[in-house]
Swiss-Prot record:
This is Rhodopsin. The keyword Ribonucleoprotein does not apply. The chain crosses the membrane at residues 37-61, 74-96, 111-133, 153-173, 203-224, 253-274, 287-308. The lineage of its organism: Eukaryota, Metazoa, Chordata, Craniata, Vertebrata. A motif ('Ionic lock' involved in activated form stabilization) lies at residues 134-136. Disulfide bonds join C110-C187. One of its GO terms (molecular function) is G protein-coupled photoreceptor activity. One of its GO terms (cellular component) is photoreceptor disc membrane. It comes from Carassius auratus (Goldfish). Keywords: Cell projection, Chromophore, Disulfide bond, G-protein coupled receptor, Glycoprotein, Lipoprotein, Membrane, Palmitate, Phosphoprotein, Photoreceptor protein, Receptor, Retinal protein, Sensory transduction, Transducer, Transmembrane, Transmembrane helix, Vision. Phosphorylated on some or all of the serine and threonine residues present in the C-terminal region. Contains one covalently linked retinal chromophore.
Amino acid sequence: MNGTEGDMFYVPMSNATGIVRSPYDYPQYYLVAPWAYACLAAYMFFLIITGFPVNFLTLYVTIEHKKLRTPLNYILLNLAISDLFMVFGGFTTTMYTSLHGYFVFGRVGCNPEGFFATLGGEMGLWSLVVLAFERWMVVCKPVSNFRFGENHAIMGVVFTWFMACTCAVPPLVGWSRYIPEGMQCSCGVDYYTRPQAYNNESFVIYMFIVHFIIPLIVIFFCYGRLVCTVKEAAAQHEESETTQRAEREVTRMVVIMVIGFLICWIPYASVAWYIFTHQGSEFGPVFMTLPAFFAKTAAVYNPCIYICMNKQFRHCMITTLCCGKNPFEEEEGASTTASKTEASSVSSSSVSPA
């Protein structure tokens, strides 16, 4: 084996030289240089100072402006809450442990850190699935006369919490476990070992199928159908200027949504699956650290994609930040009017983002 397995940890380095130490008790500077941990801490600090304001502002603006309290925005707020879970439950802890070069909170602290990071990520992922499903139902109309209401939104929020818990809770109760990963200063699901007492193998397979493959299929299907529907609507209206604009806006939004999902999850999932299916293979600590920490950027670009591209929300946000006035009032007003015209042209009030 090219790694060292200990009590509730796996260090990706052979202990043939005897230098490997528990990541709960000793700095792991034999894995990578101290400056690498400092860079990791700086990166987490950047995510904190950007992720917290933009997600908190999302919550505040929605509460401040009554017109934003729509059923669909319940899901967007849930997305912001999930990102805040990642910021407070994962990013702050990881920044602190990175400054010390090891997981200073010990085995007791590894469980809550891994839990909150996993819960926040899964809440965000399943919120995207609910958004994709809502867009498909409203725009493509597979069920005639369907209107996305408050009850549907509440059901969607409850669904995201339920699915997130079905992934984050099992490692706390004995189905798999949370252990330090990569550079040993953050905790995640154990892809590295297969102790019979924890049934890691069955949990990882379950997680990849239910919490990665299925969401990916749903998102691709829903947004694929949405783009096709908008194209068909544009053709039926003889491709008027407003319809073409609507098609471009929706297509751009969908492409960014899908790319964001892929960029966030595929590198991490691919590396985790490789490690899981190549037990004992040689890989360095950075091999898992880079995709794992890159996936955390979802807490920053999620609100940018799903909220900042929403004209109405952007207008309210600028108004809030500028003490009740929007210096871009004319531009925003024209955009809002155009958006309404475009929505009418494609026979759906929900074609433009949210």
